[in-house]
């Protein structure tokens, strides 16, 4: 995984710098998201791995599948990625691009998993508190998991806050073992 990220980083950085210079971050994010989805299709994966096809043929087919969703610069990006046999890295490239975009926008995606559904007021309060703690705008994504028993688990990048009953029981069990 780290190797894929290392290989994808220069492409994501180049796309980000181009998009930022032309004030097209949202467009490029959408285009790369589409490219990532297309590259993960089983049929497309077989085509991209086919040794008998040239990089130009792979790029042309990829661009044809995406239709008019790609502007000229995005099509060139796909051609360059194909020339260097990096089309299979498009999911990693898109993820890194979105990470750079979030850093630029001073925002962070936060996954909140709770034992019970959070209403909008609770989500708003939680987003406000997390925004103050993280010093960034928070985009909250809430989900439910009854296995937590109670409480919440918050994931923001590398930060994980486990305030669930299940997490506390696991910590207590670990403490009793030692």
UniProtKB/Swiss-Prot annotation:
It is found in: Cell inner membrane. The keyword Cell inner membrane applies. InterPro entries: ATP_synth_OSCP/delta_N_sf, ATPase_OSCP/dsu. Belongs to the ATPase delta chain family. GO terms for cellular component: plasma membrane; proton-transporting ATP synthase complex. This is ATP synthase subunit delta. Its main location: membrane. F(1)F(0) ATP synthase produces ATP from ADP in the presence of a proton or sodium gradient. F-type ATPases consist of two structural domains, F(1) containing the extramembraneous catalytic core and F(0) containing the membrane proton channel, linked together by a central stalk and a peripheral stalk. During catalysis, ATP synthesis in the catalytic domain of F(1) is coupled via a rotary mechanism of the central stalk subunits to proton translocation. This protein is part of the stalk that links CF(0) to CF(1). It either transmits conformational changes from CF(0) to CF(1) or is implicated in proton conduction. PANTHER family: ATP SYNTHASE DELTA CHAIN. It is a peripheral membrane protein. F-type ATPases have 2 components, F(1) - the catalytic core - and F(0) - the membrane proton channel. F(1) has five subunits: alpha(3), beta(3), gamma(1), delta(1), epsilon(1). F(0) has three main subunits: a(1), b(2) and c(10-14). The alpha and beta chains form an alternating ring which encloses part of the gamma chain. F(1) is attached to F(0) by a central stalk formed by the gamma and epsilon chains, while a peripheral stalk is formed by the delta and b chains. Keywords: ATP synthesis, Cell inner membrane, Cell membrane, CF(1), Hydrogen ion transport, Ion transport, Membrane, Transport. Pfam families: OSCP (PF00213). HAMAP family: ATP_synth_delta_bact. GO terms for molecular function: proton-transporting ATP synthase activity, rotational mechanism. Gene3D superfamilies: N-terminal domain of the delta subunit of the F1F0-ATP synthase. Disulfide bonds: none annotated.
